[in-house]
């Protein structure tokens, strides 16, 4: 594992790096001369735990291609950073305004902004007590290292999602194509870890998009009169795209919102074996009853949002 650490000026990057080296026995790689040398060394020693301080976007762009790389960014309140700055000899004669200007000059360089925004993990240091902050850092680093070094992944790349996370993310991506005024919903149908069909909610093909006035019921803001809605549900779209023959046996339907009752009936008829959903819906109980009576496995799953934000 190689962890690259970046952060705002005087946010505590050095403390985090020193902790990884001293407490968690990571090897510091900042003694290496150039990006190619760093990349070559890290690749040859990818089974070892290493850490490097990231200052240049060009270095990040090389390292982030490797599956064993994790980017951690650090940030802290301005008051904490000003206090740390005052302890340095270069800040002895500076006013508060001058210190803040120096911090801003570092933090708001375009390259630095892009660098920090590309992090996988973001530690927000909010604990003002130094001793409490240190213990919180140890606890949270321990937790995140356990997640990254999950033995169940069987040597898989650090940030590689599980199948459930992968397909639920695809369902969420499909939802971004929704044209419905009410809500965005996405769906993916999978068999043997292969995508059969995707779908999102909105008006049928050749009709005006819902957000352009294509469905009067949705644009009216009325939650009643569902029978007048012209929008297809995400599950319906995916099921129509797949068809019963392509669904076959042991297919799983991933949906970022629990299927409604009418979609549940169609899911049963199409032969889906399992339904995995992320968010609840007001008709959950009726849907569960239909699906479970048909012998369909139903479970809730939510993937970890990225970047992962951790309060210290």
Curated annotation (Swiss-Prot):
How activity is controlled: the entry says:
Allosteric enzyme whose activity is greatly influenced by the end products of its metabolic pathway, dCTP and dTTP.
Where would I find the CMP/dCMP-type deaminase domain in this sequence?
A: 162-291
The answer, when asked if Hydrolase is one of the entry's keywords, is yes
Give the cofactors, semicolon-separated: Zn(2+)
Q: Which residues bind Zn(2+)?
A: 233, 260, 263
Enzyme Commission numbers on file: 3.5.4.12
What keyword terms does UniProt attach to this protein? Answer: Allosteric enzyme, Hydrolase, Metal-binding, Nucleotide biosynthesis, Zinc
Q: Where is the signal peptide?
A: none
Additional facts recorded: Present with 1510 molecules/cell in log phase SD medium.
**What does it do?**
Catalyzes the hydrolytic deamination of dCMP to yield dUMP, the nucleotide substrate for thymidylate synthetase.
This one is known as: Deoxycytidylate deaminase
Q: Which organism is it from?
A: Saccharomyces cerevisiae (strain ATCC 204508 / S288c)
Q: Which gene encodes it?
A: DCD1
């Amino acid at each position: 594992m190689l962890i690259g650490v970046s952060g705002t000026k005087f946010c505590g990057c050095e403390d985090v790096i020193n902790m990884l080296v001293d407490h968690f026995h990571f090897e510091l790689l900042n003694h290496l001369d150039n990006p190619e040398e760093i990349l070559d060394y890290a690749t040859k020693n990818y089974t070892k735990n290493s850490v490097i301080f990231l200052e240049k976007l060009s270095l990040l762009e090389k390292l982030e291609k490797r599956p064993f790389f994790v980017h951690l960014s650090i940030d802290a309140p301005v008051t904490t950073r000003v206090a740390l700055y005052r302890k340095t000899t270069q800040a002895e004669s500076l006013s508060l305004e001058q210190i803040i200007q120096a911090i801003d000059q570092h933090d708001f360089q375009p390259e630095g902004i892009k660098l920090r925004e590309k992090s996988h993990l973001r530690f927000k240091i909010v604990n003002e007590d130094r001793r409490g902050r240190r213990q919180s850092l140890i606890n949270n680093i321990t937790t995140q290292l356990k997640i990254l070094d999950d033995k169940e992944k069987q040597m898989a790349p650090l940030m590689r999602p599980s199948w459930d996370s992968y397909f639920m993310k695809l369902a969420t991506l499909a939802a971004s194509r929704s044209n419905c005024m009410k809500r965005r919903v996405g769906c993916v149908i999978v068999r043997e870890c292969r995508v059969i069909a995707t779908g999102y909610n909105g008006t049928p093909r050749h009709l005006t998009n819902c957000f352009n006035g294509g469905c009067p019921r949705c644009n009216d803001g009325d939650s009643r009169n569902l029978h007048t809605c012209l929008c297809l549900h995400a599950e319906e779209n995916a099921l129509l795209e797949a068809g019963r023959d392509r669904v076959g046996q042991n297919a799983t339907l991933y949906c970022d919102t629990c299927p409604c009752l009418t979609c549940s009936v169609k899911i049963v008829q199409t032969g889906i074996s399992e339904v995995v959903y992320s968010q609840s819906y007001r008709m959950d109980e009726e849907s569960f009853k239909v699906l479970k009576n048909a012998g369909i496995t139903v479970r809730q799953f939510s993937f970890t949002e990225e970047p992962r934000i951790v309060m210290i």
